[in-house]
């Protein structure tokens, strides 16, 4: 894609009203085995959150894949300090949010896979963001986004 001359749109009309499979319930989120289903998926509707310890009592390194500004990361972890408590990687799923929070002790590298709320929006938002980062030419000056 070199440029967009009109509206960039994504059609998710192939989705029915049941975005969780039969037998699944609201409390199965934010786990990766139960992503929100959509015809548009990126990384199975999930984010891989990898943490690695740094120097004792400092913030651990957090890397999320795929990288996107669709979600936020709050790093409250502590490196190599058992008094910080058990490592916990989660998102604010009860409020249907996409704020990923790392807390507790990080004593060794670890990766957790979390689903994101509204995987179709995650796909399209990340797609458009990557187009813009590649300096996609927009004609006219604005590129409307419809989902």
Please report, for each region that a protein language model flagged, where it lies by residue.
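Conserved serine DD-peptidase/penicillin-binding transpeptidase domain
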Residues: 1-147
């Amino acid at each position: 894609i070199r440029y967009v001359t009109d509206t960039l749109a994504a059609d998710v009309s192939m989705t029915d009203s049941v975005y969780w499979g039969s037998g699944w319930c609201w409390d199965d989120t934010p786990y990766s085995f139960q992503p929100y289903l959509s015809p548009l998926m990126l990384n199975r509707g999930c984010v891989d959150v990898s943490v690695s310890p740094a120097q004792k009592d400092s913030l651990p390194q957090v890397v999320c894949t795929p990288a996107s500004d669709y979600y936020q990361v709050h790093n409250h972890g502590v490196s190599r300090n058992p008094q910080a408590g058990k490592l916990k990687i989660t998102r604010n799923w009860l409020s249907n949010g996409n704020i990923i929070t790392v807390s507790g002790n990080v004593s060794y590298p670890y990766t957790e896979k979390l689903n994101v709320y509204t995987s179709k929006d995650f796909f399209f938002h990340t797609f458009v963001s990557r187009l813009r980062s590649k300096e996609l030419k927009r004609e006219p000056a604005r590129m409307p986004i419809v989902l």
